[in-house]
Amino acid sequence: MRDIRQVLERWGAWAANNYEDVTWSPIAAGFKGLIPEKVKSRPQCCDDDAMVICGCIARLYRNNRDLHDLLVDYYVLGETFMALARKHGCSDTCIGKRLHKAEGIVEGMLMMLGVRLEMDRYVERELPGGRTSVFYQRKNSLRS
C-alpha cells in the first residue's frame, strides 16, 4: 500500500520546481524566492507520475477548491499547520483533518485509476505483519 503523504510530498517538490509552468512562478511581481528552498531540495517524482497526480489534483480543484488549495499550500509551498490555520481561520487540528480528507480523496482517485506509479517502490507502506497490500499482490500476479 502506498503512503499517500510521501506521494504528495514528492509531487509537491516536483511542482515547486516549476515543472508545470502553469500556476505559480518562482519570481512573481518582484517577489524573489516565492517557493522556499526547503521545498525545492526534497525528493521528487518523475514526470509521468506527476502528470497522473496532477490529473487527480485538477479533478479535486473542480470539485472542492478549498481542499485543493490546502494540498497546494502544504505540499507545494511548504506552509505549516499553524500558518494554514491562521489563513483559514480555524485550528491546526481542523487543518489536519481537512488535509487528511484531501489526501484520502487523492488516494482514492489513484486507487480507482488502478495505476502503478514509478515511485511506488519508494513510498510503499507495509501493513502489520510485514505484508504488502493485497491489491498490489493481485495486480502483480496477474501480470506474470
Curated annotation (Swiss-Prot):
Keywords assigned by UniProt, alphabetized: DNA-binding, Transcription, Transcription regulation, Transcription termination
InterPro entries, sorted: Phage_933W_GpQ (IPR010534)
GO biological process: DNA-templated transcription termination; negative regulation of termination of DNA-templated transcription
Single GO MF descriptor: DNA binding
Highest taxon above the source species: Viruses
Job of this protein: Positively regulates expression of some phage genes. Bacterial host RNA polymerase modified by antitermination proteins transcribes through termination sites that otherwise prevent expression of the regulated genes.
Family: Belongs to the phage antitermination Q type 1 family.
Protein's UniProt name: Antitermination protein Q
Protein species of origin: Escherichia phage 933W
Name of encoding gene: Q
